Design a protein with these regions (language model features):
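Short, ordered, surface-exposed loop/turn motifs in non-cytosolic proteins
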Residues: 46-72, 198-201
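Structured interaction patches on ligand/partner-binding surfaces of diverse proteins
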Residues: 84, 113-154
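Glycine-centered loop-to-beta-strand initiation motif
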Residues: 40, 89-97, 241, 249
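Short, acidic Ser/Thr/Gly-rich low-complexity loop/linker segments typical of extracellular
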Residues: 66-95
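A short, solvent-exposed beta-strand micro-motif common in secreted/extracellular proteins
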Residues: 95, 99-122
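Bacterial Sec-dependent N-terminal signal peptides
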Residues: 1-4, 16-49, 153
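A structural motif detector for short, solvent-exposed N-terminal "entry" segments of globular domains
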Residues: 45-48, 52, 155-213, 301-316, ...
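Solvent-exposed beta-edge/loop recognition patches
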Residues: 226-427, 435
């Protein structure tokens, strides 16, 4: 048994990724006369030794614009028939996709490294828990004009966290009389390692959820060099005594550790929760038998001392550790503001152990608004959302099951990309995960 120690590589956010999103809104695709070929150049992480190849990696491109067409894929690209194509990089790190409709695309890839592979690639000792390498670009314009110019896809590398955010239930539900219900919300964290882990003192940060958002990623990069994340609340697992989380198991954090199962089929008995965010709010009944989460910081005043998990999102979450007094950290009223009624906390990106970017559905586009991402690529290269912008659907977002250990323990999907790692369900129960 050991107290988990963690360090995170501080990686620079790509200005190129930001600029491509801006360009996408300025290009007219209606004059495109033919299908085009797309060449993607995958560049190795900065930590790799000079000349170390990325190897054969699968790159995925997904058309996110509205342009229609019947393009086919040949060469190294393979079409899935769903607006998504996959291609494998060659010895130079290049993947070619032929017959693409000029439009806007998301491009991504990810792969794992063992500690030994990390040592071989970087020349530095690696963590036994392994590493994730990810690369992504959102809203990349593809036009005839840039057909001959490779799209640069920069990879970043980070340790695989042993403790991960595994489930978020923020949607709420409706009872038999169609009345909305919110007290049954909860968060789960999962010990992905093979050893018990002392998680006492762990901080759980809820990302700011304002509209418009307090800082866009571009603004955070401009003002804080991409080294801060903005949160509205921070809760802490009490640090006064050890809390050992067994290997391959879940810690359940709730707003009301009571039995909610009589409200609807989407609510559950949460009396077995590990920790509860105590509140004087009349809608949230406290359970004195369940330990209290410590409210370490809040943008809001009482009685909003429960976890402010927004029904339809955004509802992003980070977890981190620090020995510092977080109340002394820099706070902000928002981009360009020096005064205001709501003050938010700035968390150093370098200490974040895991993060999930949970976005709100855009009713106009039918998907999430990627421009509202709160987390950098090296924390979460993707995002997750539920089907309703207003919530009350009973939907839970949860990590896919990647496999099992020799003794039957769960291995949850963790590629640092929530678009890959998470699914949405209305039936999955607390502390349970799918088999895949």
């Amino acid at each position: 048994m050991h107290k988990y120690k963690y360090s995170f590589f501080t990686l620079h956010f790509s200005l190129f990724t930001l600029l491509t999103g801006l360009l996408a809104s300025c290009i007219d695709y209606d004059d495109a006369s033919r299908l085009v070929n797309v060449k993607v150049q995958l560049n190795a992480p900065a930590e790799y030794l000079p000349g170390t190849p990325v190897g054969e990696q699968v790159i995925t491109i997904t058309k996110t614009g509205t342009k229609t067409g019947t393009g086919t894929s040949t060469g190294t690209g393979t079409s899935t028939g769903t607006g998504t194509m996959t291609g494998t990089t060659d010895a130079s790190g290049i993947a070619v996709f032929e017959g693409c409709m000029p439009d806007v695309y998301d491009i991504s890839t990810s792969w794992e490294l063992t500690g030994a592979e990390y040592l071989a690639a970087t020349g530095k000792p690696g963590s036994a828990n392994g590493y994730m390498v990810t690369a992504s670009i959102s809203e990349q314009p593809v036009t005839e004009a840039q057909e001959q110019t490779p799209i640069m896809l920069q990879a970043v590398i980070a340790p695989k966290p042993a403790l991960i955010i595994s489930k978020i239930y923020c949607a709420g539900s409706r009872d038999a009389n169609n009345k909305t219900y919110i007290p049954g919300k909860y968060i789960e964290l999962f010990n992905q390692s093979d050893e018990p882990m002392d998680i006492s003192g762990l901080y759980i940060g809820l990302l700011e959820s304002s509209s418009p958002q307090v800082y866009s990623l571009a603004q955070l990069n401009e003002v804080y060099n991409g080294e801060k994340v903005v949160v509205k609340q921070v809760f802490q697992i009490p640090a006064d005594e050890p809390f050992l989380l067994p290997a391959r198991s879940t810690v359940l954090l709730v707003n009301s550790a009571t039995d909610h199962s009589d409200v609807s089929e989407h609510e559950y008995d949460l009396r077995g929760a590990d920790f509860e965010a105590k509140s004087t709010d009349s809608r949230h009944e406290n359970n004195e038998a369940v330990k209290a989460l410590t409210l370490a910081f809040s943008t809001f005043s009482a009685p909003l001392t429960y976890m402010n998990l927004m029904q339809g999102g955004p509802c992003g979450i980070i977890i981190f550790n620090t020995d510092e007094d977080i109340t002394t950290w820099e706070k902000t009223y928002g981009y360009g503001k020096t005064t205001g009624t709501l003050s938010y906390l700035l968390v150093p990106k370098s200490i974040i152990r895991d993060g999930v970017d949970f976005l709100k559905k855009n009713n106009t586009s039918g998907g999430a608004d990627i421009s509202t991402k709160r987390l950098y690529q090296d924390i979460d290269a993707g995002y997750i959302n539920i089907s309703s912008a207003s919530g009350y659907t009973g939907e839970v977002v949860y990590r896919r099951t990647a496999g099992t250990t020799a003794d039957g323990g769960k291995i949850l999907m963790d590629t640092n990309n929530s678009s890959n790692d998470f699914k949405v369900s209305t039936t999955i129960k607390p502390r349970e995960y799918d088999e895949e």
